[in-house]
């Protein structure tokens, strides 16, 4: 059974890992983090042309081999367009249900690897017409408000 120090170490590592942006197709930051963690444990890592990270650990050759694999990527969005009013239109990468999106906090990673916070815009319930109140907004109509006044911001 693991001791409290090991549990805390695993918890800290897991927290660090899930906070790294790793949208499908853009998992390099996650791969670099994992590679560093594994090298710190004196394990050799390699990467293939598809971006997969491979770590091999020598074991007892008389015992069966074990493989452990997991996704490094996350579901999310890519910026499709920035409107003249500064609102950001996005396109799906993965299968996030539309009904789960309204008013969610969003972190955008720009082309300089800087983080930009935003929120998925949502017409408030009390400002909605009766026929709008319980309709899920389509991804085509979803926008992110990151506080920009215009496209140039």
Language model segments and positions:
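N-terminal hydrophobic/helix-forming segments and targeting peptides
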Residues: 1-153
């Amino acid at each position: 059974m693991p001791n409290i120090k090991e549990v805390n170490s695993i918890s800290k590592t897991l927290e660090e890992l899930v906070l790294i942006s790793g949208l499908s197709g853009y998992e390099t930051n996650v791969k670099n983090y994992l590679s560093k963690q594994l090298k710190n444990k004196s394990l050799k890592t390699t990467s293939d042309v598809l971006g997969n990270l491979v770590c091999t650990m020598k074991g007892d050759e008389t015992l069966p081999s074990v493989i452990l694999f997991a996704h490094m990527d996350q579901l999310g969005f890519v910026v499709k367009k920035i409107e003249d009013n500064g609102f950001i239109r996005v396109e799906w990468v993965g299968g996030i249900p539309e009904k789960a999106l309204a008013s969610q906090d969003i972190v955008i990673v720009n082309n300089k690897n800087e983080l930009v916070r935003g929120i998925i815009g949502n017409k408030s319930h009390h400002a909605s017409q009766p026929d709008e109140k319980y309709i899920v907004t389509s991804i085509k109509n979803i926008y992110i408000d990151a506080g920009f006044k215009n496209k140039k911001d």
